[in-house]
Amino acid sequence: VFFIYTVATVSEDRYRLCIELISFILRRKNIMMKYLQKLGRSLMLPVAVLPVASILMGIGYWIDPSGWGGGSPIAAFLISAGGAIIDNMSILFAVGVALGMSKDKDGSAALAGLVAFLVVTKLLSTGTVAQLTQVDAEAVNTAFGKISNQFIGIISGLVAASMYNRFSHVQLTPALSFFSGKRLVPIMTSFAMILVSAVLFFIWPVVYSGLVAFGTSISELGAVGAGIYGFFNRLLIPTGLHHALNSVFWFDAIDINDIGNFWASTGTPGITGRYQAGFFPVMMFGLPAAALAMYHTAKDKKKKVAGGLLLAAAVSSFFTGVTEPMEFAFVFLAPG
């Protein structure tokens, strides 16, 4: 009887422990989901600007398809206007995430996001790394030349928002009272990003080199490798790290140079263009179809709002190949 009682007691304790563990996991999962949903809403602020910028660039390329603005001042103006947004997408992410993730959506958080991004991209730029390591700029890891990406922008925004939520109401001594409250946030963000930069100094080259090495290995798989490349290209777009993978196939990193050979007509039929052709069905038909599906599944009261955003994103994808507005829409938000 004592043995049966002991086993039953132990089993009951284990059962209770399992229930508590499952409850803890579910609570953590719920917190994480709410955090990611808030991050998604924050990202939609900068993402909303992208379709207009993409359309401006698309019109410019349509006016001057061969010279890309070199043969038409109007085309050059439109391409430059749109490129000002697209080329600085990571800065928009830093500001938008910092503002959206702050507790009261104050402009000081947005300023802190900009400060965070400027600090990390300056400290980890090729020139600064060359000075810190006492080597020539040409000898610096190429990863530091790609530090201004969306992934770094999101990290900068999250750090800035965290600093704002923590220090925006801190009051310093009377002698330093001018720097109290919200004025303290950009200062603390700068110090925090120095530490983040120190960590990224060691981690970022490994991440970037790993992506390049991965691209090099799958390039040896022929057509199957092209499919794998396309899959991971789409997967990495929300972080901006797809540029590391693209550099392996599109340019002359490992003697593939897909874009260069295609435009120079010096490639091999059936091989050259392999790492570009698969994008056209997705950009011209797949994503616009996804936009239509999201519009139809949106709630009736939100169809007009969703329709405006999705139409601009679909046009951007079809005509210009800029797919981020569409992809960020369904990665971070539900259709409704």
Put a short name on every predicted segment.
Residues 2-6, 13-31:
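Short, Lys/Arg-enriched N-terminal segments with co-localized hydrophobic residues
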Residues 33-174, 178-180, 333-336:
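Early transmembrane hairpin of solute transport permeases
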Residues 42, 58, 162, 175, ...:
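Membrane-spanning helices that line or support transport/gating and their immediate boundary helices
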Residues 67, 120-131, 188, 221-228, ...:
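Juxtamembrane membrane-interface segments at transmembrane alpha-helix termini
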Residues 83-89, 146-151, 181-187, 218-228, ...:
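Membrane-interfacial loop-to-helix junctions in multi-pass transporters
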Residues 89, 266-268, 275-335:
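Alpha-helical membrane segments and immediately flanking helix-loop junctions
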Residues 197, 204-254:
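Aromatic-rich transmembrane-lumenal/periplasmic boundary elements in polytopic membrane proteins
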Residues 245, 249-278:
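Interfacial juxtamembrane loops and adjacent helix segments
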